[in-house]
Amino acid sequence: MTLWINGDWVTGQGALRVKRNPVSGEVLWQGNDADAAQVGQACRAARAAFPRWARLSFGDRQVRVERFAGLLESNKAELTAIIARETGKPRWEAATEVTAMINKIAISIKAYHIRTGEQRSEMPDGAASLRHRPHGVLAVFGPYNFPGHLPNGHIVPALLAGNTIIFKPSELTPWSGEAVMRLWQQAGLPPGVLNLVQGGRETGQALSALEDLDGLLFTGSANTGYQLHRQLSGQPEKILALEMGGNNPLIIDEVADIDAAVHLTIQSAFVTAGQRCTCARRLLLKSGAQGDAFLARLVAVSQRLTPGKWDDEPQPFIGGLISDQAAQQVVTAWQQLEAMGGRPLLAPCLLQAGTSLLTPGIIEMTGVAGVPDEEVFGPLLRVWRYDNFDEAIRMANNTRFGLSCGLVSPAREKFDQLLLEARAGIVNWNKPLTGAASTAPFGGIGASGNHRPSAWYAADYCAWPMASLESDSLTLPATLNPGLDFSDEVVR
């Protein structure tokens, strides 16, 4: 039984789904998808649970959420292993994901009060108050690259605000989704407050098509995000928060420490096997001898990055991609870039056929026309050379996306210029593109989102504002507007 609906674990009535380790092929999880009827049941359960959950005090909801944080802590080793085995990422990285999930609780509580708490301003004849109210029933679509942390970034603030939820994990990480839901069950959530439906496209379409949804929170690809945006068009009553990908540029200016710059670039482009939405996809490198030296060093160090299994010792920097199909898509993208005229610097290589262990790829595209403005979700870095910083910024902005952008340079004035001209929601200076703070908003512009950033700003899309003018007594004003006569004289 792999679906959690109205507090009960039930068997899906849809197609059988089997999840295997992307490197070894070991069967990790199997269960049946939720069919459309079960998705409807989950929605009705969430709707029925909403009034009581929303009427609880914030403190009562906070107790359950903090109990979940404690369960994450006590089950950290087990959940780390589940995430690592299912995604293929190394154990060390899965552990950092669980730690981020734990830290998210306190951050979300603080964000709730600062972003969407209550405010009161005294007035001469009363007060003006601001409160926030939950939307109702929200659908949460989770991604596979961080199957615990990223859905958690929607679920926790939504629950704190008083919403009820239907959660659909990625069909590529059902085991992680189920494991997290079982911890929520132990935390004592009332039946129907949080529901789990497993499945792929058909389940997702049934969920997003529900008429009784009050909103949908999504993290994933731009293609799917656009489909959801079109599907919910003409329904302004539903909140839609989209966090999508990017074709992210990293600008390398003059650097004093080449190895430090190479380390930052590798962290930006290849961590999580390139499967982070903020990963650098485009390296913009200044022309000249120093740029040549940097590029040679980057290729040499990247060549020594050998992907490994989730439990290898010593631990590898990167593991496998989410599937062998995903790895093959990166290889295909590389081949297409080379056929367009790209100059190969480091070819990606599958270490073993039928697995997702893929070495990084680097290819120079300077002077090549018609390069697709698409996100290749894997360890593939394209390089362009530039002559001056104004050109670098123009190249950085030459994308329909706008998630992250970074600069490696000792010059503060160049970063200040980038801050003014960059079109990206995250702009870093001498820090990896993949570095983000939960105490800041996380999101982008253009094809990277719909102006509903998550992380610190997740509280904003989990509640709506209610403004009130209030007075505990009613008296006739001392001065009346012109034309109003409350005298006792009879008008004839």
UniProtKB/Swiss-Prot annotation:
According to UniProt, the name of this protein is: N-succinylglutamate 5-semialdehyde dehydrogenase
NCBIfam families listed in its UniProt record: arg_catab_astD (TIGR03240), PRK09457.1 (NF006992)
The record's listing under PROSITE patterns reads: ALDEHYDE_DEHYDR_CYS, ALDEHYDE_DEHYDR_GLU
Active-site positions, per UniProt? 243, 277
Q: Which family does it belong to?
A: Belongs to the aldehyde dehydrogenase family. AstD subfamily.
Q: What is the lineage of its organism?
A: Bacteria, Pseudomonadati, Pseudomonadota, Gammaproteobacteria, Enterobacterales
UniProt function note: Catalyzes the NAD-dependent reduction of succinylglutamate semialdehyde into succinylglutamate.
Any one Gene Ontology BP term:
arginine catabolic process to glutamate
Example of a GO MF term = aldehyde dehydrogenase [NAD(P)+] activity
Q: What pathway does the annotation place this protein in?
A: Amino-acid degradation; L-arginine degradation via AST pathway; L-glutamate and succinate from L-arginine: step 4/5
Q: Which domain of life is it from?
A: Bacteria
Q: Which residues form the signal peptide?
A: none
Write the record's keywords in alphabetical order, separated by commas.
Arginine metabolism, NAD, Oxidoreductase
Residues the entry annotates as binding NAD(+): 220-225
Q: Species name for this entry?
A: Escherichia coli O17:K52:H18 (strain UMN026 / ExPEC)
The EC designation for this entry is: 1.2.1.71
Top EC category: oxidoreductase
Name the chemical reaction catalysed here.
N-succinyl-L-glutamate 5-semialdehyde + NAD(+) + H2O = N-succinyl-L-glutamate + NADH + 2 H(+)
* InterPro entries xref list: Ald_DH/histidinol_DH (IPR016161), Ald_DH_C (IPR016163), Ald_DH_CS_CYS (IPR016160), Ald_DH_CS_GLU (IPR029510), Ald_DH_N (IPR016162), Aldehyde_DH_dom (IPR015590), SuccinylGlu_semiald_DH_AstD (IPR017649)
